[in-house]
């Protein structure tokens, strides 16, 4: 457990997990109401 690579790996794993969770929250949670949809803005 004194290996710095172990702590770096844990930190990197939690960092990537938090970025993924935040992007899912923004994409599907309450902030998604403010996102614009370019397909709805485009008129045929």
Curated annotation (Swiss-Prot):
Annotated keywords: Chloroplast, Membrane, Plastid, Thylakoid, Transmembrane, Transmembrane helix
Membrane protein topology class: Single-pass membrane protein
GO terms under biological process: photosynthesis
Stored InterPro entries: PSII_PsbN
Chief location: plastid
Regions that span the bilayer: 6-26
One protein family per Pfam: PsbN
Compartments (UniProt record): Plastid, Chloroplast thylakoid membrane
One CC-aspect GO term: chloroplast thylakoid membrane
Record bears the keyword Thylakoid: yes
Family: Belongs to the PsbN family.
Alphabetized PANTHER family for the sequence: PROTEIN PSBN (PTHR35326:SF3)
Function according to Swiss-Prot or TrEMBL: May play a role in photosystem I and II biogenesis.
Protein name (database record): Protein PsbN
Organism from which the protein derives: Stigeoclonium helveticum
């Amino acid at each position: 457990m004194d290996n710095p690579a172990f702590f770096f790996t844990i930190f990197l794993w939690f960092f990537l997990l938090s970025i993924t969770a935040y992007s899912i929250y923004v994409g599907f949670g309450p902030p998604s109401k403010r996102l614009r949809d370019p397909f709805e803005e485009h008129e045929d």
